[in-house]
Amino acid sequence: MSLNIAIVGAGAIGGYLGVKLALSGNNVTFIARGENLKAIQANGMTLNLEDGTSLHAPNVKACTIDEATPHDYVFLTMKSHQVSPVAEQIGRLCHDNTAVVTLQNGVPWWYFYNLVGEYQNRQLTSIDPGGAQWQHIGPERVIGAVVYPAAELVAPGVVKLIEGNRFTLGEPSGEKSERVTALAQAMIAAGFKTPVSTDIRSELWVKLWGNLTFNPVSALTHATLEDICNFDLTRNLAATMMAEAQTVGEKLGVQFKISIDKRIAGAQAVGAHKTSMLQDIEHGKALELEALLGSVIELGRICNIPTPTLDSVYAMTRLLEQSVLRKGKGLSLD
């Protein structure tokens, strides 16, 4: 069955998804802007693979968010802080049965939607200020997703895959609904590994656990994952941050299936990799700090769990971001 899909944010991950979904027979529309929009409208989207070969999707559609019409599935592939400003326009991409797939890093804005317990339907101000996403997109539309691949937009309309093809999907309720099953089947047919999780929040925390630690520490120190893990003081800092976050997560029912030491060892094994947050500092871009760290601090406040180390790292990283944005240029030690 062919799906009618809009991809909001035709960057690295959005382009990767869109090319493969289009080539497997789905109707894909990229919501883009600027030179990227012009390139896709003129030439389609190209995906350069790890082995040096390329895939080209010439027949995809592309338009601005204000020109787009409703679709059956709407993929949100931009960064977390970029969603709220266009939440109202995203809402206009939806008909009564549209599913919205959230692919952002960090704690999602819909985290407490229908989550059984004392915090059910609590809204998170750190990642959805003013409740724009809750109001205009609606948590009932959401399918959660965890993104594992790495890719790069190397030119307008051209994406390079670095590695990976796994996207885990899950309903906030944990049910294997018709809509999530149909989407998973379409993604598998397109060549992705797409398990459907019955506990998407715990799946999100597995990735978040590393991101909330290594991203801000790398931004502050300009160190790679390998450097952070090999230096005793920053390795200990990472362990302390992860322990504070684990306490918050477990209070909310999250199950951590590996130890802190194993999670750090996994990051160390990645090697001399610059995190996305460090790359954003180097290029003078806004950070995903609220989604990755501010949201976890907010969860701690809600649960009455202190997070002193997370608070300190957040404060320093927030000031660094403000300084970089105020000066209008990136900061690099290379």
Spell out what each predicted region is.
Residues 39, 93, 134-207, 213, ...:
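Internal alpha-helical scaffold of NAD(P)-dependent oxidoreductase catalytic cores
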Residues 1-50:
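NAD(P)+-binding Rossmann beta1-loop-alpha1 motif at the extreme N-terminus of oxidoreductases
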Residues 3-4, 72, 165:
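Nucleotide donor/acceptor-binding cores
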Residues 46-49, 117-120, 159-162, 213-214, ...:
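Short, hinge-like loop/turn segments at secondary-structure boundaries
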Residues 2-3, 227, 235-334:
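NAD(P)-dependent Rossmann-like dehydrogenase/reductase catalytic/cofactor-binding core
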Residues 54-154:
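Rossmann-like NAD(P)(H) cofactor-binding subdomain of soluble oxidoreductases
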Residues 31, 50, 63-65, 145-147, ...:
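Conserved beta-strand termini and adjacent loop/short-helix elements that scaffold enzyme active sites
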